[in-house]
A protein has these predicted regions:
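Conserved acetyl-CoA binding element of GNAT-fold acetyltransferases
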Residues: 75-90
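Acidic/histidine-enriched, glycine/proline-rich intrinsically disordered or flexible terminal extensions
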Residues: 160-206
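Conserved acetyl-CoA pyrophosphate-binding loop and the N-cap/start of the following alpha-helix
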Residues: 91-92, 96-104, 114
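Conserved active-site alpha-helix within GNAT-family acetyltransferase domains
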Residues: 111-114, 121-148
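Short hydrophobic/aromatic beta-strand or adjacent loop that forms the aromatic wall/cage
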Residues: 48, 149-153
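Internal, conserved structured core segments that host functional sites
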Residues: 49, 53, 84-87, 114, ...
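A short beta-loop-alpha structural element at the N-terminal edge
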Residues: 2-14
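Active-site rim helix/loop that mediates acceptor-substrate recognition in acyltransferases
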Residues: 15, 22-70
């Protein structure tokens, strides 16, 4: 197993992997592959943390990171970071690859001086990589009451003391909504991939 930086020659393979990993998981079909495709030209994209996982000679996993921010109570912006999509090919899920890729990428982020991470996810999985419910760190999720414990809004301090005295609200970076903002462009892009059936399944969020 090898983890390395994503290269331009990997782009299409990684986008197809992302599509396979997320298809019908959170909604009928998925948009994560388009988010990734568009994010590479986004100023918030962190190319040093766009990583692929190789097993048996093929790409089976990928993760990307983005700059983000917290809005403090006085209205100022405080640097934050997030990650995702993180994708593991369906044939390799539930075998520990996702956690290995995540932990590797977090270690790289820490080495780069990234102070903290915010994200939306399942605490039952992400606690194994050091995440906690963000409200315990004084962080709030946009659109929710400040005193609400939002169980899917998670955070982790990477630099000790980075969040000391900090209380703020996290807004998901706009780049993650590109498919909603440009639905026709998204549909045209998705049509370049093999046709798949969109299904409404239990547990989907959208």
């Amino acid at each position: 197993m090898e983890i390395r930086l994503e290269q331009e020659k990997d782009y299409r393979e990684v986008e197809n992997l992302t599509r396979e990993a997320f298809w019908n998981v959170y909604r009928p079909g998925c948009v994560e592959h388009y988010v990734l495709n568009q994010y590479r030209n986004n100023a918030d994209f962190i190319p040093e943390l766009s990583l692929v996982m190789i097993e048996e000679g093929k790409i089976i996993g990928h993760v990307m990171y983005s700059k983000a921010s917290l809005t403090l109570d006085d209205g100022t912006e405080f640097p934050a970071w997030t990650f995702g999509p993180i994708s593991i090919h369906p044939d390799y899920k539930r075998k520990g690859y996702g956690l290995k890729l995540l932990n590797y990428s977090i270690a790289k982020a820490r080495e780069m001086g990234i102070g903290m991470l915010c994200m939306e996810g399942n605490i039952d999985f992400y606690k194994h990589a050091g995440f906690v419910v963000a409200s315990t760190l004084g962080l709030h999720y946009h659109g929710e009451p400040k005193d609400a414990e939002v169980p899917y809004f998670l955070a982790q301090e990477l630099t000790p003391g980075y969040l000391d005295g900090i209380e703020g609200t996290y807004h998901t970076p706009r780049g993650y909504f590109v498919a909603d903002e440009h639905p026709d462009d998204f549909e045209a892009y998705d049509a370049t991939f093999p046709e798949r059936v969109k299904a409404v399944l239990d547990g989907q969020l959208f």
